[in-house]
């Protein structure tokens, strides 16, 4: 099963997270299938590759709680509903 979750990057006390599609059996820093965005909690910046996120969601990937909240703010789920109604 594939999950969309955060992968920690950056240095000590300056964490930056990548949003990645990764197998659930892999550890947090394990090999990812694809990088689909990033989240910087210090500067409060996010970048999401919306087509890539939609691709993995349509294939059955489950986002973690934090990634779900980030995606909701980016209105990814509205685009998912629009694609499903077509």
Curated annotation (Swiss-Prot):
Its main location: plastid. It is found in: Plastid, Chloroplast. It comes from the Eukaryota. One of its GO terms (molecular function) is structural constituent of ribosome. GO terms for cellular component: chloroplast; mitochondrion; small ribosomal subunit. Keywords: Chloroplast, Plastid, Ribonucleoprotein, Ribosomal protein. GO terms for biological process: mitochondrial translation. The keyword Protein biosynthesis does not apply. Pfam families: Ribosomal_S16. NCBIfam families: S16. Belongs to the bacterial ribosomal protein bS16 family. This is Small ribosomal subunit protein bS16c. It comes from Liriodendron tulipifera. The lineage of its organism: Eukaryota, Viridiplantae, Streptophyta, Embryophyta, Tracheophyta.
């Amino acid at each position: 099963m594939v999950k969309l979750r955060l992968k920690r990057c950056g240095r000590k006390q300056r964490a930056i997270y990548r949003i990645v599609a990764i197998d659930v059996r892999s550890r947090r820093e394990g090999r990812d299938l694809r990088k689909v965005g990033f989240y910087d909690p210090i500067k409060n910046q996010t970048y999401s590759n919306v087509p890539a996120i939609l691709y993995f969601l349509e294939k059955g990937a489950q986002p973690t709680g934090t990634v779900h909240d980030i995606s909701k703010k980016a209105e990814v789920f509205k685009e998912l509903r629009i694609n499903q109604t077509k």
